[in-house]
Amino acid sequence: EQGYPVRALTRSTEKVQRLFDNRVEAVVGDIRQPETLPPAMTGVGYLICATGTTAFPSQRWEIELPEGSGGLAGVIGWGRILTDATYRQQHSRNNPHIVDALGVANLVAAAPADLKRFVFISSVGIQRQKQFPFSALNAFGVLEAKQQGEQAIQQSGLPYTIIRPGRLIDGPYTSYDLNTLIQAKTQGKRGVAIGQGDTLAGDASRIDVAAACVACLQNPAAENQIFELVNQGSRPAELDWNRLFASLN
């Protein structure tokens, strides 16, 4: 809608076609495999990183227990996944550390040197990892991993914007969580609040987060900024992103 040609880095072209109905160019790659990234970076001026995995062990972690780990052995294996951090890292290929820390660092390293903006979707709670409920969310290190991803971006020398949304709601419903099951929506009734210092909490519409990503691409007030985004208050007829970004320090 804003006139940007879009290239989607994906492990599944079918998924991209299903979500975007062939309106974007799909390039196969995997941030966990840095050798797959350079072909996707040719001619890229702006990069939006919206990758992630589940905060808690799930099928999306691609857990691989030792061969023959059925029955009681499987139960023991899952017990170790839940309680032994080293074992967990060794036997899961898509956990937060691999995706949100190492994967983001791989993407940073592959980004063109003349990139105009690197936008990263992180999470509220990065600076509140020891406070409930973020301590529970971070039980398996997702906030630590996202923080490491943020640091890789900040230390890269690339111009960046880091957005820390609240709990994501609205479609597309691709996550395996309670919100997906109930398909919660803002239904356009709540406004957008942004803040700094990791003080905000609440829900954030995926639609509004996506709009913020696009709005900040060429906005100088959002360059090299980190901010939280949640939905709260009454919603104006039209969101004024210039006004919102102007409040950033």
Where are the regions a protein language model picked out?
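NAD(P)H-binding glycine-rich loop region in Rossmannoid oxidoreductase-like domains
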Residues: 8-112
